[in-house]
């Protein structure tokens, strides 16, 4: 049972990307920081916004890379390397085209599925892909050629409300995630209705 020591929220930096679908992971980490009453601060050493809190005596670090999505691994590798955090102690939250809005799923390992942030993290961790992923459903535009504009666009209010509700649900299973109770966390999360 592996406890999580680092939670990464993927997104793109800058006000123009703040509320876009591609920043679902960053939104998740912001919500954790708010719930824990901590501020995320810019740290050039780790190429991102960072924060730290303690859960039952265990340090948990938060990271939102301030690199663009396709360089997210630079931030993850810098922070994980400095604090000697193993890939299996990392949870990466990211937007997921293959899940509808309002659905969130946990997964250990696997490929990048075309997600440039995951692709770079895997590469920067020395081709190790055995980190946990929180896949936050954003839906799919239906046509591959529309994906880029879709993920970089803002979700309509109804879709955003579903994403917010799924993040709230995940926040409720965080104690299991922090404790390394992955089977229980997955069972609870995967029984959620969109």
UniProtKB/Swiss-Prot annotation:
Cited CDD domains: PTH
Residues engaged in binding tRNA: 17, 68, 70, 116
Active-site residues (renumbered): 22
An example molecular function term from Gene Ontology annotations: peptidyl-tRNA hydrolase activity
Site-annotated residues for Discriminates between blocked and unblocked aminoacyl-tRNA: 12
GO (cellular component) term, any one: cytoplasm
Keyword tRNA-binding included in the entry's annotation: yes
Signal sequence annotation: none
Subcellular location: Cytoplasm
Gene3D superfamilies: Peptidyl-tRNA hydrolase
Stored InterPro entries: Pept_tRNA_hydro (IPR001328), Pept_tRNA_hydro_CS (IPR018171), Pept_tRNA_hydro_sf (IPR036416)
Keywords, ordered alphabetically: Cytoplasm, Hydrolase, RNA-binding, tRNA-binding
Catalytic activity: an N-acyl-L-alpha-aminoacyl-tRNA + H2O = an N-acyl-L-amino acid + a tRNA + H(+)
Predominant location: cytoplasm
Any one biological process term the GO annotation gives: rescue of stalled ribosome
Quaternary structure and partners: Monomer.
Name used for this protein in its record: Peptidyl-tRNA hydrolase
Organism: Pseudomonas fluorescens (strain SBW25)
